Amino acid sequence: MDSVRTFEACFLSTAAEITFFLKNITTTGNRAQSTKVVLNTLTAIVVVWICYRAVIYPKFISSLRHLPTAKRKYPLIGYGPAQFANSRGELFLEMAKAIPNEGLIRFHGFLETENLLLTSPEAIQEVLVKNSYNFIKPRGAKALFDRFLGSEVLFASEGPNHRNSKKHMQPPFNLSKVKILYSMFWDKAVKMSDDIGRSVIPSEKEILVTDVDMHAHNATLDAVMRALFGEKIEKSPYKHEILRLLDSVLGGSWDVTAYFMMTAFLPLWTLKLIPGGINDRVNFSSYRLRQSVRAFLNERKDESGSNKSDDIAMEMANSDYFTDDELVANLLGLMMAGIEPTAAGFVWIAWYLAIHPDWQTKVRNELKANIAHRFFTDDPTSFDAASVLESLPILNAVCNEGLRLKPPAPTSNRIAKFDTTILGHPVKAGTRIFISPFVSNRSEEFWGLTAAMYDPSRWLGDQKSGRKEVYNSRGGAATSTHCGFLPFLHGPRKCIGSIYAQAEMRAFIACLVGRFEFEMADKEEEMISAGILTSKPKGGLKLRLHKVKKW
């Protein structure tokens, strides 16, 4: 990598000297002749540079040249586009299956940059757990968060800053706090089911159909805001302002998608090239969004007894660790991280149940045997959701199996902070490291020959007692390092709100299955994954629903 930088520095230096040379040529004839010579020279330099990057360095100089290497997909850009493909994990899974390896696969990205894909539990454990702070988030991700949120957030911080921030953010994310919010999650799940019941419309064949994805997004957004900002947000005028502004910058339109991609990978001046005024709109909306959250928090702080609040925002504020800017930025970051991944996880679990009616029926029978029907409709607040939902083995099995096969974030990547090693192989500073939950969660090494199959029964059964109805949190994975099941990653940088997300999905799935029998509206539809940050069904999830009779 050092030799590459040296070569590039020489290239830029030569180009600068040529430019200076041209500026100091006075006669037209000399200028024309010299320009031709210079252009030929530059062309030769570019050709040599390409040969060096594409052939000489990777084959004869790179310290990673002895590792199993994927054949280049395209000249000079390699597997670079795979970072933006809708089904990001599938290409890496093909790579891991096709190339014999012992935990590391080398592949090339844009401009022949070297990347590593981790495939073994030992390699993943080394990067995510043992030496997690030796591998940092990409610069583009930090630029994206800083640009939108205005201050450093937990997800983009590194080293001591990350450790200290997580230490002071952790208290409201422990299991006891989540159990307090379970009743709220259940209440939101019941309201979502009510909305679904009201929204189903007759199709041309008089079949009741609705897009569950839309309802999931709205319900998750409502639940996340309630968990973050407390009950007061429900009736606050700031709620609608925050929702409106958040939608304006995360609405998913083509220009917003282009904006975030360019923010992450290109200089800021390129943002002004996007037509339609998206740069000014995002800047203005981001500023107004931060101001609205700040104003709401100031109101809360001024209330008597606010220090007794159990919502996340006030607990973080009362820690006295975060500045006002950091508090606002981290709360908005938690909103971004909590909405789409949770909604996407729920939708994928629902999709699997729609195409596997036998498991849908098993979940429904389990619910009927353990939960009175009135808790699904008339009396949701009296239901002890935490203790009951977490104790249902089949419900937990289908949730975990859906997350295993369709993790909301199918790939994640890190950058080597300095020269280091992985599994004893030298890795230069700046090398991009890819961890793919999509690959690990479907690895035959971890899950056996049925790794690619939907089989919630793998999460059921206790080998010691022989009881088949007991929930098995390992799912029968042949690894004890947790690296075979990575829907929320692992180690110090594991998603801080993972137990919140799982509790919410559990409640939403239970309520949906308890209220409706459902199947795909179009049984021939091929479900395609889509999304830059989160993987979700392209075009939503349209289901045909029938209300479940009272029991």
Swiss-Prot record:
Its cofactor is heme. It is found in: Membrane. Gene3D superfamilies: Cytochrome P450. InterPro entries: Cyt_P450, Cyt_P450_E_grp-I, Cyt_P450_sf, Cytochrome_P450_monoxygenase. SUPFAM superfamilies: Cytochrome P450 (SSF48264). Glycans are attached at N24, N174, N218, N283, N307, N441. The chain crosses the membrane at residues 37-57. Heme binds at C495. It is an enzyme of class 1 (oxidoreductase). Its EC number is 1.-.-.-. Its main location: membrane. Induction: Expression is induced during the early biotrophic stage of development. Expression is positively regulated by the ABA cluster-specific transcription regulator abl7. GO terms for cellular component: membrane. Keywords: Glycoprotein, Heme, Iron, Membrane, Metal-binding, Monooxygenase, Oxidoreductase, Transmembrane, Transmembrane helix. It is a single-pass membrane protein. Signal peptide: none annotated. GO terms for molecular function: heme binding; iron ion binding; monooxygenase activity; oxidoreductase activity, acting on paired donors, with incorporation or reduction of molecular oxygen. Cytochrome P450 monooxygenase; part of the gene cluster that mediates the biosynthesis of abscisic acid (ABA), a phytohormone that acts antagonistically toward salicylic acid (SA), jasmonic acid (JA) and ethylene (ETH) signaling, to impede plant defense responses. The first step of the pathway catalyzes the reaction from farnesyl diphosphate to alpha-ionylideneethane performed by the alpha-ionylideneethane synthase abl3 via a three-step reaction mechanism involving 2 neutral intermediates, beta-farnesene and allofarnesene. Belongs to the cytochrome P450 family. This is Cytochrome P450 monooxygenase abl5. It comes from Leptosphaeria maculans (strain JN3 / isolate v23.1.3 / race Av1-4-5-6-7-8) (Blackleg fungus). The lineage of its organism: Eukaryota, Fungi, Dikarya, Ascomycota, Pezizomycotina. The gene is abl5.
